[in-house]
């Protein structure tokens, strides 16, 4: 048998789904149980999961923030595949504003890192939201997907969802809950396909970054 390994480095930027996974306050906790067991005579092991559509790393569907928006089964896929720019926003305070981004170059997809270390074991509400004006500016630059290692592009207590609404206005897409701890600022290939869920307001992703072909 031949052994194949990609010559380009891969970063897994997904959260691990597990009991105890931090969740949005009041949302459905992640649960997993084995329903068929080989140690009980079944020829196979089979499990059952319960979770929110916004558990872990996920892509919001427009249905999440617009009553007539596309569901997760209807979203096009090209936004979630291709070259992206990872931006280190750890020095920013308050919210990610246009003034914080003078170094952003042209890119179809922009991912923001704000945590020094991703909070795998606790829910933190002190993340950096993305200003609606920043979304508007990114859209003018041709950006079609915004990603963040935060649980949301808006503040936890937001009632206006202004960043989400700006994304909707420009038919952009959102990835939330990324894990970017080990990823240096720069350009990568993104692959992060949300699950195809009818009536889904979001789809869980196994998101990865890969070195661009000419890197190194």
From Swiss-Prot:
GO terms for biological process: anthranilate metabolic process; L-tryptophan catabolic process to kynurenine. It is an enzyme of class 3 (hydrolase). The keyword Metal-binding applies. Its cofactor is Zn(2+). Pathway: Amino-acid degradation; L-tryptophan degradation via kynurenine pathway; L-kynurenine from L-tryptophan: step 2/2. Binds 2 zinc ions per subunit. SUPFAM superfamilies: Putative cyclase. Zn(2+) 2 binds at residues 60, 164, 176. It holds the Pfam family Cyclase. Its EC number is 3.5.1.9. Keywords: Hydrolase, Metal-binding, Tryptophan catabolism, Zinc. It catalyses: N-formyl-L-kynurenine + H2O = L-kynurenine + formate + H(+). Substrate binds at residue 24. The active site is at residue 64. Zn(2+) 1 binds at residues 54, 58, 60, 176. Coiled coil: none annotated. GO terms for molecular function: arylformamidase activity; formamidase activity; zinc ion binding. Belongs to the Cyclase 1 superfamily. KynB family. Catalyzes the hydrolysis of N-formyl-L-kynurenine to L-kynurenine, the second step in the kynurenine pathway of tryptophan degradation. Homodimer. PANTHER family: CYCLASE-LIKE PROTEIN 2, KYNURENINE FORMAMIDASE. This is Kynurenine formamidase. It comes from Erythrobacter litoralis (strain HTCC2594). The lineage of its organism: Bacteria, Pseudomonadati, Pseudomonadota, Alphaproteobacteria, Sphingomonadales. The gene is kynB.
């Amino acid at each position: 048998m031949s052994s194949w390994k990609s010559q380009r480095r891969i970063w897994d930027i997904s959260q691990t789904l597990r009991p105890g996974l931090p969740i949005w306050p009041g949302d459905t906790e992640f649960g997993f149980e084995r329903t068929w067991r080989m140690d009980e005579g079944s020829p196979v092991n089979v499990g059952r999961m319960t979770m929110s559509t916004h558990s872990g790393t996920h892509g919001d569907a427009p249905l999440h923030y617009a009553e007539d928006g596309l569901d997760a089964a209807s979203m096009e896929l090209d936004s979630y595949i291709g070259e992206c720019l990872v931006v280190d926003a750890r020095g920013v305070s308050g919210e990610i504003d246009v003034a914080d981004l003078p170094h952003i170059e042209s890119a179809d997809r922009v991912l923001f890192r704000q945590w020094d270390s991703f909070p795998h074991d606790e829910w933190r509400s002190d993340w950096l939201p993305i200003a609606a004006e920043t979304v508007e500016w990114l859209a003018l630059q041709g950006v079609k997907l915004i990603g963040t290692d935060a649980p949301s592009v808006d503040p936890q207590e937001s009632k206006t969802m202004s960043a989400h609404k700006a994304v909707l206005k420009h038919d952009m897409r959102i990835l939330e809950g990324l894990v970017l701890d080990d990823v240096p600022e720069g350009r990568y290939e993104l692959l992060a396909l949300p699950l195809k869920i009818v009536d889904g307001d979001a789809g869980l992703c196994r998101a990865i970054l890969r070195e661009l072909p000419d890197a190194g």
